[in-house]
Amino acid sequence: MTRAVALTGRLTFRPGQVPGIAGERPQLAERLLRGRPGEAAPHLLPRLFALCGEAHGVTAALAVNAALGRVAAPEPALFRRLAHETACEHIRRIWLDWPLHLASGPVPSTFNSRVPQRELIDCPMLKASHSESAAMLAWLERAVLGTAPRRWLAHWHEDPAGCLSTWATKIHTWPAMAMRQCMQVAQAMASMPAPLLPHASTDALRELAQSLAGEADFPCRPSWQGRVFETGSWTRLGLADCSAFGNMWLRLGARIAELVLLSLRDGMQASGEAHDSPCLQMGALALAPGQALAWSEMARGLLMHWVRLVDTPQGPVIGGYRIIAPTEWNFHPDGAVAHMLAHLAPFDAADVRRSIGILVAAYDPCVPYTVEFAESLGDTVHA
């Protein structure tokens, strides 16, 4: 085992087998933070979870403040930080991962492979000096949508499936082409989402917090109300109907739609326009004295932090710290991806790999994985 795998963990995908997933990620937060002052959590965790460091830092700050009795509505700046990181992560995954996981078959002769690279480099949102929202919306229109962002998003809200089909078949940007190439297979991968929404209810949050506090291995194998749920950009608390995303095609589309929405909201804030509420929710709940649970909706789904502070002569220090990240729900051995993997018919290794690529693009495990076929195929693939 390499040092990197020891830190991040590794998943094994087992198509056509039960369970469809094996392996887990190490729970490092408590080992890193135990005995440190509470204020250490929002400073150290972003270094441990670099890809989504902002989300972990924001959520840790909310949890520690609530445990110290400082419960208040999150400041607007926290929502802006979370939204910016989420949009950037969507862009990176679409440009860096989708070429590996979604593209298949012949590439059109008119396609220049250097164009996506230039577009990623030119993306205003990814620049350290990003401040011009109009430039980001213009980039979205040119590099992603092929039409005005507001027009595309209005079509999406009216008819998600129709919007994606029209866009993927008529527009020649790199993301549209990638979606076009996986369209038939992704649409056939039907699965009604079971959305993880405990942050809709204080009672549900308390129930989850009780499990987190009482079961050391709960973050590795979380469940709620006896079930394993899924989380992603298609299960946001602010969405009217999560059941509209009934296949992998629409779940992939939800990431595009959220990128567009976050970019438009960024533009509205820059111009002083009002809007009803943040796209992404966050909050904290004080529990027993010195304990709190905080949550945030980040790029891969719902992130939860639980903290327990203990008093010492030098002041409160961390006595317990547990995190449930979206990966633990989505790639649970009894979760959504595992069920899809178990039902894949492993007769053609190439077809199975393509289906796995679509699942990985939609749910994004954020850790290395291995594909382990049944003995009849005699093949193991590393990714």
From Swiss-Prot:
Source superkingdom: Bacteria
Keyword Mitochondrion: no
Coiled-coil regions listed in the entry: none
Keywords: Plasmid
InterPro entries assigned: NiFe-Hase_large, NiFe/NiFeSe_hydrgnase_LSU
PANTHER family per the UniProt record, alphabetical: HYDROGENASE EXPRESSION_FORMATION PROTEIN HUPK (PTHR42958:SF4), HYDROGENASE-2 LARGE CHAIN (PTHR42958)
Name this polypeptide is given: Hydrogenase expression/formation protein HoxV
